[in-house]
């Protein structure tokens, strides 16, 4: 059976300024690349990041492009991804409550400044967090 850890909705994982929106076109070396499938939230390095909804940490690792990255499974094939962290404070297999600190804002991987790249995923689809999350603080 599946547990719906997202029953209370999704909270914003960090307070900050939205600097990149879902679906925006990315340009790399002057060439268009695939659209951005998350939102970028700028905040100072070291700003705490909280789990947007309860769930199980299914990945916490340092990846080439996204730097320190966490994926939390919320049940029913729904997950959230947090990338470019400076530090992670959870590990794969941990269960987290909504609002638990999972890491801090950083500038790791392919990044141009300290921010959180936050994504919500359903199966292999990416969803716009701004349409799903509770009101932005």
Model-found features: residue ranges?
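Catalytic cores of peptidoglycan-degrading enzymes
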Residues: 11-137
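Surface-exposed beta-loop interaction hotspot
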Residues: 1-7, 15
């Amino acid at each position: 059976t599946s547990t719906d850890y997202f029953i209370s909705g999704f909270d914003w994982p960090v307070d900050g300024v939205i600097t990149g929106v879902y679906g925006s076109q990315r340009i790399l070396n002057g060439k268009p690349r695939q659209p951005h499938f998350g939102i970028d939230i700028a905040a100072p390095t070291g700003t705490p990041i909280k789990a947007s909804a309860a769930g199980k940490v299914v990945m916490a690792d340092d990846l080439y492009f996204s730097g320190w990255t966490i994926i939390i499974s919320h049940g029913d094939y729904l997950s959230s991804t947090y990338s470019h962290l400076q530090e992670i404070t959870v590990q794969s297999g941990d269960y987290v409550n909504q609002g638990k600190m999972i890491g801090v804002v950083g500038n790791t991987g392919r990044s141009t400044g300290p921010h959180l790249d936050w994504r919500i995923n359903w199966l292999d689809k990416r969803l716009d967090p701004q349409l799903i999350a509770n009101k932005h603080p």
